[in-house]
């Protein structure tokens, strides 16, 4: 073992499904509703009175000073559903589940309830993760790759800088090595600016529910560099 952290951590579709169900969408149907308990919130969702991602207030069992107590929390219906699987001994988990947070959550469960119940918990989140990824219908769509409107300006500015560097070299103001380094610097700067623009647009698209962005942000698959190559520019070769 490298650091003692659990290695039985869900991946890919499972992570994506759990991330999706715990994400909050501002203005979703049923936002602001108050429920007496978890069961009430789940019934309201099943009866289509509120959305899976709506922010609601629910009275839940949570750890307060090491003791389980009932208290009202601002959460989402999706998080209530996830907490049906999480052992009550670790309290109410009120956050977005990503691959990173899952590792800590699993470690807490193992510490609190032991291996046997932790295995049941892992089976439960595995099944829920797969089911929610299926229900969400998340896939890689061409329309999910958002090309930033600033792309033409950013690339154009970079090309102008490179042209100036080449002109300086041809006039003998800089050496060949300096020319090479300055061209690399110019395109690296363009690439970084484009990546920032791509991620800004992806984060804001569909209130953060862009399928490709969710795959990236959850840790299920992909990286910012890969998305930037698809929506921005291929980059330096």
Predicted regions and their residues:
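Feature marking long nucleic-acid-engaging regions of large polymerase/nuclease enzymes
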Residues: 1-176, 226-236
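Gly/Pro-rich turn-and-neighbor structural signature
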Residues: 177-231
